Amino acid sequence: MTGKSVLREAREVQLAVTLIGLGARLQFLEQEVGLSRERRVRLYKEIKGVSPPKGLLPFSADWYMTWLANIHASMFYNIYRFRAQHADSELDALVDAYKMYLSHVEVQGGEAVLDFTRAYTLVRYFSSKILETTACVRCKGNFVTHAYE
């Protein structure tokens, strides 16, 4: 009898709980977690207390170019690049970097501009070479820019 490992399923549920807690949408969970849609929806409702949001994921790289979004996106992506060098997987790097981003914003007394979905989309845009970072000539910080500009 072949069945799903109880330990593997427990890890999948824990991963889903972590991702939902960070604000991941069902479309993201579908790609990263091997649970059925029904279980993902039930988990989401149990954790958030509401039905999951419907609609499309963000699709415009231009959103990251406004000054406040750019500062937050640049901060997150620089954290992500560092974490990606030391993480076991891209997903671990994404989760760790997003937690560090939220922690940094909280310590500074600010509000997070980048939600988890936008952070994930940002990483995808870099992987697709739609966005890149460019160093500022004054401060030498790396900021998110459109590729090929």
Predicted regions and their residues:
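Long, charge-rich, low-complexity intrinsically disordered regions
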Residues: M1-T18, L22, L26-Q27, Q31-E149
